[in-house]
């Protein structure tokens, strides 16, 4: 007999630094999931992304067991790391906060390719460049 899905939760947690506090506790507590077990498994799986926000999708079953899928870090956080800034521009059309090269955008697109809705690497690179522009980051090259 297959397990019946009780619910699904989506949230972002810093890689390798999950705790039972929000957003993990508030999202999974209502399903009765063992938070300590989730935190330990998540931290083990994402320790190489220490501190980088990682999107996670948790599927909870009727016996309170769970499976989770981790996605690649958001493009915005990868761009901020590449550009060496803490946050994007509040007024991206007027204030430019940093510069990245097209090669850096292509590298980010390579890492995010499986999560992006793009047919090839060129389309994915253009999507990353659009994200950079909307953050007030200039794309050179």
From Swiss-Prot:
Xref: InterPro entries: Ribosomal_uL11, Ribosomal_uL11_bac-typ, Ribosomal_uL11_C, Ribosomal_uL11_C_sf, Ribosomal_uL11_CS, Ribosomal_uL11_N, Ribosomal_uL11_N_sf
Residue ranges the record marks as coiled coil: none
Post-translational modification: One or more lysine residues are methylated.
CDD domains, A to Z: Ribosomal_L11 (cd00349)
Record-linked Pfam families: Ribosomal_L11 (PF00298), Ribosomal_L11_N (PF03946)
UniProt keyword annotation of Iron-sulfur present: no
Any GO MF annotation of the entry: structural constituent of ribosome
Keywords: Methylation, Ribonucleoprotein, Ribosomal protein, RNA-binding, rRNA-binding
PROSITE patterns reported in the protein's UniProt record: RIBOSOMAL_L11
Gene Ontology cellular component list: cytosolic large ribosomal subunit
UniProt keyword Amino-acid biosynthesis present: no
Region (Disordered): 1-23
Function statement: Forms part of the ribosomal stalk which helps the ribosome interact with GTP-bound translation factors.
PANTHER family with a match to the protein in the record: 60S RIBOSOMAL PROTEIN L12, LARGE RIBOSOMAL SUBUNIT PROTEIN UL11M
HAMAP family: Ribosomal_uL11 (MF_00736)
Similarity remark: Belongs to the universal ribosomal protein uL11 family.
NCBIfam families: L11_bact
Subunit-level organization: Part of the ribosomal stalk of the 50S ribosomal subunit. Interacts with L10 and the large rRNA to form the base of the stalk. L10 forms an elongated spine to which L12 dimers bind in a sequential fashion forming a multimeric L10(L12)X complex.
Name under which the protein is recorded: Large ribosomal subunit protein uL11
Species of origin: Rhodopirellula baltica (strain DSM 10527 / NCIMB 13988 / SH1)
